[in-house]
């Protein structure tokens, strides 16, 4: 949408509002709009550590600013909203101090910006980091950027270098941008099975630093994931959507079957029956599954919203297809399924594509009942704006 010779403006280039004292979300944002809940779940409320909201607000604010500068070649400027929410105690000059968002914008608004296009933040050790590195030249003096050198490092939380490399960058004209696709190989060896790291970028021109940036990444060994599976237990898999590729990638042992009847065969002596991608289920199969579960059998439904509703209609009434689906929040962070997983780690998975990677493809609508434990959820941000119903 364009109008010749007329500027376009946007109301509230906003990413949320921490209060000026603790850093928790402002009350109206927290309790009426409920947007903080969609981002960080129960960490949004006053009993939680405000660091979760401050960290998330800094992330989305910085990412939004960098994304616009990487992609919009016709923007003359961006007015981010609102400055007073990026600091603690803005009304007291003796005690004012910046929140994390200030530092995120300080990096994002450098005149010469080195910026990584990262879609996923949770990755496996030894894999190639799928990214484009952009150089945006908005120098205040209007000069072109000469051929430069990009230095990259993967660092652990102590700043120790785990992997590094350099890439040449061609000249970039003023008011232009250029990207490269460097070969960044994530380290094979990590200090722990799951390690918090940073991608650190430094751009130099004629040996002098002109831009720097950093991005948090969560790296894990495949053994960390597979280690949650008890190999002494027998897993039987009915696979209709190639979930076996995931199991094979993680070296999880399983026995494949081709039907519900075969899956539930007592001769297999399964400890866990996994059903993945089964979109239809007849009455006989439904009765078999319910009978198996009622006798103590363990079933895991993956990507089967239709089958789950068919088998348990008294509990599951339908589903919602999320418009985003990149963030899932924990309803029960004390559940064993979340052992060794932090509350902000059910998001920004990696699928090696230039698209928002989904953490969920559907949200089941369930009755509140003593037989139902909701482990995790997903809620659309600003769901009320386009006519959404409160119950949805």
PLM regions: where:
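Aromatic-Pro/Gly-enriched surface loop or interdomain linker
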Residues: 196, 208-272, 303-306, 314-327, ...
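A glycine-rich, often tryptophan-bearing local segment used as a flexible ligand/cofactor-contacting loop or short
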Residues: 279-364
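Loop/turn elements at helix/coil->beta-strand transitions in domains of secreted/extracellular proteins
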Residues: 4-7, 71-78, 232-233, 268-271, ...
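Extracellular/periplasmic ectodomains of large secreted or surface enzymes and adhesion receptors
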Residues: 103, 107, 114-124, 165-173, ...
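Substrate-binding clefts and catalytic carboxylate motifs of secreted carbohydrate-active enzymes
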Residues: 2-164
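Short, Gly/Ser/Thr-enriched beta-strand-loop segments that form substrate-interacting elements
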Residues: 374-391
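Short, well-ordered secondary-structure micro-motifs within conserved domains or adaptor modules
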Residues: 1, 263-283, 298-300
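Beta-strand-rich binding/interaction modules
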Residues: 128-171, 177-183, 187, 193-205, ...
């Amino acid at each position: 949408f364009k109008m010749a010779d007329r500027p376009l403006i946007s109301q509230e280039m906003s990413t949320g509002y921490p209060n000026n004292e603790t850093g928790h979300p402002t009350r109206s944002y927290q309790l009426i709009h409920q947007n903080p809940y969609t981002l960080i779940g129960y960490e949004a409320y006053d009993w939680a550590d405000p660091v979760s909201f401050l960290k998330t607000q800094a992330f989305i604010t910085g990412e939004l600013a960098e994304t616009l500068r990487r992609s919009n070649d016709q923007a003359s400027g961006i007015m981010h909203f609102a400055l007073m929410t990026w600091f603690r105690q803005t009304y007291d000059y003796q005690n004012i101090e910046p929140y994390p968002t200030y530092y995120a914008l300080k990096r994002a608004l450098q005149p010469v910006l080195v910026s990584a296009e990262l879609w996923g933040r949770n990755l496996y050790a030894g894999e190639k980091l799928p990214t484009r590195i952009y150089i945006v030249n908005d120098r205040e003096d209007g000069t072109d950027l000469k051929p430069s050198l990009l230095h990259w490092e993967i660092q652990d939380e102590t700043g120790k270098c785990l992997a590094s490399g350099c890439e040449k960058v061609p000249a970039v004209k003023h008011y232009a941008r250029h990207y490269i696709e460097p070969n960044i190989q994530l380290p094979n060896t990590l200090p722990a099975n799951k390690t918090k790291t940073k991608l650190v970028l430094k751009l130099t021109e004629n040996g002098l630093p002109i831009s720097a940036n950093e991005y948090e990444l969560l790296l894990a060994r495949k053994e960390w994931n597979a280690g949650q599976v008890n190999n002494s237990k027998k897993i039987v898999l009915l696979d209709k959507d190639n979930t076996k590729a995931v199991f094979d990638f993680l070296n999880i042992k399983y026995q494949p079957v081709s039907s519900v009847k075969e899956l539930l065969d007592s001769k297999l002596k399964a400890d866990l029956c996994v059903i993945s991608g089964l979109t239809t289920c007849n009455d006989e199969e439904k009765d078999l599954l319910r009978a198996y579960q009622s006798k103590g059998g363990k079933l895991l439904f993956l990507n089967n919203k239709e089958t789950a509703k068919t088998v348990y209609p008294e509990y599951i009434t339908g589903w919602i297809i999320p418009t985003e689906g990149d963030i899932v929040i924990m309803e029960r962070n004390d559940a064993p399924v979340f052992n060794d997983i932090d509350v902000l780690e059910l998001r920004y998975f990696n699928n090696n594509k230039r698209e928002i990677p989904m953490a969920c493809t559907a949200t089941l609508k369930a009755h509140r009942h003593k037989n139902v434990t909701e482990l995790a959820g997903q809620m659309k941000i600003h769901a009320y704006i386009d006519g959404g119903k409160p119950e949805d």
